[in-house]
Amino acid sequence: MPVWGGGNKCGACGRTVYHAEEVQCDGRSFHRCCFLCMVCRKNLDSTTVAIHDEEIYCKSCYGKKYGPKGYGYGQGAGTLNMDRGERLGIKPESAQPHRPTTNPNTSKFAQKYGGAEKCSRCGDSVYAAEKIIGAGKPWHKNCFRCAKCGKSLESTTLTEKEGEIYCKGCYAKNFGPKGFGYGQGAGALVHAQ
């Protein structure tokens, strides 16, 4: 005889999950509204979930919490760690003394909370939520593109020349070595006698 009113228990809140609101993951059931990252509380789906010891995370938080750590294992811009590679025999650079800069913005708010830096491409103010640092300078996310082809860049995929940023392909075409045997790939080399 069937048990009426029963259902699986939610893996997050422990209450009964009915079929219309059920999300299944790793053999467990969740309410749609409970299927959230344990750290940032972002909504998850089958393409964004990562599981560790029966806890669910978005891929970004999972990588920060359980991913590889140490020299050479960055998870992209903004998640750099402080391992300087001393165990590998790499000698750390001596720390440079802090030199305060003069902020030309004289508003009391800007002096107290920091004025907005200027984007290296368009010259407009760049605020923290939209700022990317590349080649040591601030950029808007939309301005952080190759100066030649307009391709969107990441801090690890850019090259810089004379204050401008380029994708590796455009940099090689425009500023790389020139002459016989360069720039066409190994299949285009010709042996002339």
From Swiss-Prot:
Signal sequence region: none
InterPro entries documented for this protein: Znf_LIM
GO biological process: cell differentiation
Modified residue annotations for N6-acetyllysine: K112, K131, K137, K161
Keywords of the record: Acetylation, Developmental protein, Differentiation, Isopeptide bond, LIM domain, Metal-binding, Nucleus, Repeat, Ubl conjugation, Zinc
Modified residues (N6-succinyllysine): K137
Keyword Oxidoreductase (UniProt): no
GO cellular component, as recorded: nucleus
UniProt xrefs under SMART domains: LIM
A Pfam cross-reference name: LIM
Location within or outside the cell: Nucleus
GO MF, one example: metal ion binding
Residues of the LIM zinc-binding domain: 10-61, 119-170
Residue ranges annotated as motif Nuclear localization signal: 64-69
Cross-link annotation Glycyl lysine isopeptide (Lys-Gly) (interchain with G-Cter in SUMO2), location: K91
Quaternary data: Interacts with KAT14. The LIM domain 1 is necessary and sufficient for this interaction. Interacts with GLRX3.
PANTHER family: CYSTEINE AND GLYCINE-RICH PROTEIN 2, RHO-GTPASE-ACTIVATING PROTEIN LRG1
The protein's role, per its UniProt record: Drastically down-regulated in response to PDGF-BB or cell injury, that promote smooth muscle cell proliferation and dedifferentiation. Seems to play a role in the development of the embryonic vascular system.
Name under which the protein is recorded: Cysteine and glycine-rich protein 2
Organism in which the protein naturally occurs: Mus musculus
